[in-house]
């Protein structure tokens, strides 16, 4: 199944890439269990960076669960513009069941897409 891979070209890898999104984000979506920060990029396509701290989700099982669902829903959502997104987990993100979390993440990705498109249209 080559079409379902989440490769290195779809991830933020270096600290400088993360810092750039933290410093220059143009879109922000807040949810009680996570925060999404996004910045337009020029040449990469859409990329995702995950920040899931041990302080907010203490167990490795919980952190891996949140990462897996965030990656999967991001991969399935199609972003028409090239953006870098940081998913920042908050306390309680691992307490949601997978169906609820997947649905809430899809809604968050849709809101982020709409907000980024509006921001891009405003700046054009």
Task: Label each PLM-derived region with a short phrase.
Residues 1-124:
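Positively charged, solvent-exposed patches that mediate nucleic-acid binding
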């Amino acid at each position: 199944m080559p079409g379902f891979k989440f490769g290195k070209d779809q991830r933020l890898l270096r600290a400088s890439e993360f810092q750039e999104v933290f410093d220059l984000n143009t879109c922000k979506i807040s949810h009680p269990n996570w925060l999404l920060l996004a910045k337009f990029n020029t040449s990469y396509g859409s990329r995702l960076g995950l920040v899931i701290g041990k302080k907010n989700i203490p167990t490795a099982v919980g952190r891996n669960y949140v990462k897996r669902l965030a990656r999967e829903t991001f991969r399935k959502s199609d972003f028409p513009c090239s953006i870098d997104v940081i998913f920042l987990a908050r306390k309680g993100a691992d307490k949601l069941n997978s169906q609820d979390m997947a649905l809430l993440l899809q809604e968050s990705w849709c809101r982020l897409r709409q907000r980024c498109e509006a921001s891009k249209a405003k700046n054009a």
